[in-house]
Curated annotation (Swiss-Prot):
Cell surface transmembrane ligand for Eph receptors, a family of receptor tyrosine kinases which are crucial for migration, repulsion and adhesion during neuronal, vascular and epithelial development. Binds promiscuously Eph receptors residing on adjacent cells, leading to contact-dependent bidirectional signaling into neighboring cells. The signaling pathway downstream of the receptor is referred to as forward signaling while the signaling pathway downstream of the ephrin ligand is referred to as reverse signaling. It comes from Danio rerio (Zebrafish). Gene3D superfamilies: Cupredoxins - blue copper proteins (2.60.40.420). GO terms for biological process: angioblast cell migration involved in selective angioblast sprouting; anterior/posterior pattern specification; axon guidance; axon target recognition; blood vessel development; blood vessel morphogenesis; cell adhesion; cell migration involved in sprouting angiogenesis. Pfam families: Ephrin. Residues 260-270 have a biased composition (Low complexity). Residues 247-332 are cytoplasmic. This is Ephrin-B2a. Disulfide bonds join C59-C98, C86-C150. Residues 25-225 are extracellular. Belongs to the ephrin family. A motif (PDZ-binding) lies at residues 330-332. InterPro entries: Cupredoxin, Ephrin, Ephrin-B_Ecto, Ephrin_CS, Ephrin_RBD. The keyword Glycoprotein applies. The gene is efnb2a.
Length: 332
């Protein structure tokens, strides 16, 4: 009964986890070079990954061993302010180094809320994450900290985790007003900020909030089912272990030898006194009554075995010094 119940709950746990993981997708790989047409001028590449999805950012290999068309980049994950200005700092750690043109180098992004790795990336629903490169594609400009292909080629990735394309842009992350355009800027700044323009439709906002809340509720239900199933399985395992432990202890007690305390005899072999002579000539040993007394703290582990294996009980008599006449009894 317990074994079948354990299998049932284990099956429920596996099914719940499969339902939760079936939503995970492997997104198309992003090739980081200037020939990739997915980078929209003035906007970059906007993605909508969900929790559990995976995506590779690939530094493509140059075919034929030719050095023509070789591009060198360093990719960084930056906050919104650095995305707008296309800047990085010395404290920023590169996410990916594209410095080996003779082989494919890639970095896999796994969109998970909790990472088992101490240095792993963690993503949260409803938040935006940004990847840019301030390198200009050459080895000399590999360590540039400003501009680069982020500004000239709009090579930047905006990842809206756990969101939908119909969701509005959050006003807390993006400004609601913009400075006027200046003709001397040539429209570069305005183009680079096109992705930052908010959607002003109130109906779209309500729809986006509804989709977002429904997806969050669904994922929470699946997670709760996994946790509940795992908890039930752990409880069943604990109960089974306790039951087996009690059963083992009962068997151990049943097979262990049972010891009993023994009784020792305190004997006083005093002759029966006559009326005049005071001797015991002619008296029989059966006329002497020997009192029995339980000896304190006396333990004989062989007593039960002797009395059970050899017929009549055998008593172990302890020799004691003569005692006072008060302990002597006479047969009348």
């Amino acid at each position: 009964m317990g074994d079948s119940l354990w299998r049932y709950y284990f099956g429920v746990l596996v099914i719940a986890c499969k339902v939760n993981l079936s939503r995970a997708l492997i997104l198309d790989s992003i090739y980081w070079n200037t020939t990739n047409t997915k980078f929209v001028p003035g906007q970059g590449l906007v993605l909508y990954p969900q929790i559990g999805d995976k995506m590779d950012i690939v530094c493509p290999r140059v075919e034929g061993g030719s050095m023509e068309g070789v591009e060198y980049y360093k990719l960084y994950m930056v906050p919104l302010e650095q995305l707008k200005s296309c800047q990085v700092t010395k404290a920023d750690t590169p996410l990916l180094n594209c410095v080996k043109p003779d082989q494919d180098v890639k970095f896999t992004l796994k969109f998970q809320e909790f990472s088992p790795n101490l240095w792993g990336l963690e993503f949260f629903r409803g938040k935006d994450y940004y990847i840019i490169s301030t390198s200009n594609g050459t080895m000399e400009g590999l360590d540039n900290q400003e501009g680069g292909v982020c500004k000239t080629k709009s090579m930047k990735i905006i990842m809206k985790v756990g969101q939908n394309p119909s969701d509005p842009i959050s006003p807390k992350d993006y400004p609601t007003s913009y400075p006027p355009k200046h003709p001397d800027l040539g429209g570069k700044d305005s183009k680079s900020n096109e992705v930052l323009k908010p959607d002003a439709s109130p109906h779209g906002e309500d729809k986006g909030d509804g989709n977002k809340s429904s997806s969050v509720i669904g994922s929470e239900v699946a997670l709760f089912a996994c946790i509940a199933s795992a908890s039930v399985i752990v409880i069943i395992i604990i109960i089974m272990l306790v039951f087996l432990l009690l059963k083992y202890r009962r068997r151990h007690r049943k097979h262990s030898p049972q010891h009993a305390t023994t009784l020792s005899l305190s004997t006083l072999a005093t002759p029966k006194r006559g009326g005049s002579g005071g001797n015991n000539n002619g008296s029989e040993p059966s006329d002497i009554i020997i009192p029995l007394r339980t000896a304190d703290s006396v333990f004989c582990p062989h007593y039960e075995k002797v009395s059970g294996d050899y017929g009549h009980p055998v008593y172990i008599v302890q020799e004691m010094p003569p005692q006072s006449p008060a302990n002597i009894y006479y047969k009348v």
